[in-house]
């Protein structure tokens, strides 16, 4: 499982016919929305090059669109090009200083780079702008846990649970926090809650599959010591 709640992408081979239409310069508002959707699907399927090309062309036509920079930054990050990701996040925030998702994404960059204090500052900014940003609550809790602030990390995860989203993920992270904090009974209970919530998937490349596998490993580690 990734250290923070990043997306996990697979592989895509087929180009979108809408890409050719955009290259011809005949885009409409509806088509632009469709192309952004295509870029997301391409990225989720692992075809980062085509996804980035779509967003880059949209940016060329609308350089004032902060969301496109933020989305392209996320795909750069997922593809391993973290320097370009940071540049795009910064540009997105220059264009729209109230874009909570860009603060969350930039915080993920800082966390992955070991800059935990900078990450916390950006997560807090994201949550100030959007208190319902569940991923920012989860990510902030992981960063606090990395800093040894277990009690506050638990509080953040309990806040995240109030919104009724990503419960399996939240229970997994709360279980891991209890685990590292030494409260093994609470950890085991949360790991079991997470496994009951997460779907069983045959796709071994999916995020839920890798998350289940990680939780099972953590749980088995604790059950081994109990025996």
Annotate each language-model stretch with its function.
Residues 36-44, 67-78, 87, 101-112, ...:
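Conserved alpha-helical positions within TPR/SEL1-like repeat arrays
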Residues 57-60, 91-94, 124-128, 158-162, ...:
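Conserved structural position within tetratricopeptide repeats
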């Amino acid at each position: 499982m990734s250290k923070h709640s990043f997306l996990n992408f697979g592989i895509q081979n087929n180009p979108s016919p809408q890409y050719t239409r955009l290259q011809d310069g005949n885009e409409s508002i509806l088509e632009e929305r469709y192309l952004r959707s295509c870029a997301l699907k391409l990225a989720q399927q692992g075809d980062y090059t085509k996804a980035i090309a779509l967003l880059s062309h949209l940016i060329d036509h609308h350089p004032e669109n902060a969301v496109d920079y933020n989305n392209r930054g996320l795909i750069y990050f997922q593809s391993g090009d973290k320097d370009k990701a940071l540049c795009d996040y910064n540009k997105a925030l220059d264009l729209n200083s109230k874009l909570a998702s860009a603060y969350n994404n930039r915080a993920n960059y800082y966390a992955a780079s070991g800059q935990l204090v900078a990450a916390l500052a950006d997560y807090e900014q994201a949550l100030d702008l959007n208190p319902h940003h569940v991923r920012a609550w989860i990510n902030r809790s992981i960063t606090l846990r990395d800093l040894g602030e277990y009690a506050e990390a638990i509080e953040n995860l309990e806040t995240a649970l109030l919104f009724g989203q990503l419960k399996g993920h939240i229970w997994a992270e709360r279980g891991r926090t209890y685990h590292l904090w030494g409260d093994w009974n609470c950890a085991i209970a949360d790991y079991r809650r997470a496994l009951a919530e997460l779907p069983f998937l045959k796709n071994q490349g999916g995020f839920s599959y890798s998350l289940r596998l990680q939780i099972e490993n953590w749980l088995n580690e604790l059950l081994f010591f109990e025996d």
